[in-house]
From Swiss-Prot:
CDD domains: LDH-like_MDH. One of its GO terms (molecular function) is L-lactate dehydrogenase activity. This is Malate dehydrogenase. Belongs to the LDH/MDH superfamily. MDH type 3 family.
Amino acid sequence: MKITVIGAGHVGATAAHRIAEQQLANTVVLFDILEGIPQGKALDMYESGPVGLFDTKVYGTTDYNDTADSDIILITAGMARKPGMSREDLLMKNATIVKEVTDQVVRFSKNPIIIMVSNPLDIMTHVGYIRSKLPKERVLGMAGVLDSARFRSFIAEELNVSMRDINAFVLGGHGDSMVPVVKYTSVAGIPLTELMAQDTIEQLVDRTRKGGAEIVNYLKNGSAYYAPASSAVEMIDAIVNDRKRILPCSALLEGQYGINNVYIGAPVKLGKNGIEQILEIDLDAPELDALRKSAAIVEENCNNLASLLA
């Protein structure tokens, strides 16, 4: 198993290290355009092997040739958000970057699974799908796992319970229009609505929607990376080990939820072939309406990129 991580910034490097530590691949390639950065970080990771007790080979490179025959490609390249920026503000700049990256990686790896992390997430996943010409099952985005993790962490903090006992789904676009689905949120099987007042739930939902911006505002010059990297690696683990995990991911919907030809966060079954099934769960009317509105925002932004992707 060979996994390539594109982008040796905070998210990419953290993800590469977690992949190596968990021995999800025999070889991890960390790619970046800045000479020395991926090589130095990869060597540092490899040298942690005797302490972390892993044998994964980790290489850094600025040459796409070294990514050849990758089974999974994690794309984290792009500009990070700054205070006051929305994910959509990054649209044109990161679309150009993701287009170039995708064009290059598929030259050397013929049938990889591509996991997108670059923002704005759902739109960049669309860019990766169009440019790679891979089957839709093999191009997906990391969004809902992260958004759900944030929602779960806020619930655990509020109730002072273990995060392990929290189950939650956040669907829709990876942005302010995301849709935390409260009806499927539970604590050790107990519906959240039985443990928490509605106004408190609404506060946590709002905080989840603004979770990325909250961290950006603290950091001033950068964005979240521990939780995004961990979320991406959870998806990789599900694929590498064919776990058939049900996780919320950005997937190409073709009629599900009344949404057509748009990448948006939905519950999927993840296995060795990528997305093996998109689950169409029952949503309340307001949730379904919010999901469709979220998809409409993604679709509009994708349409604005038509000339770039031609």
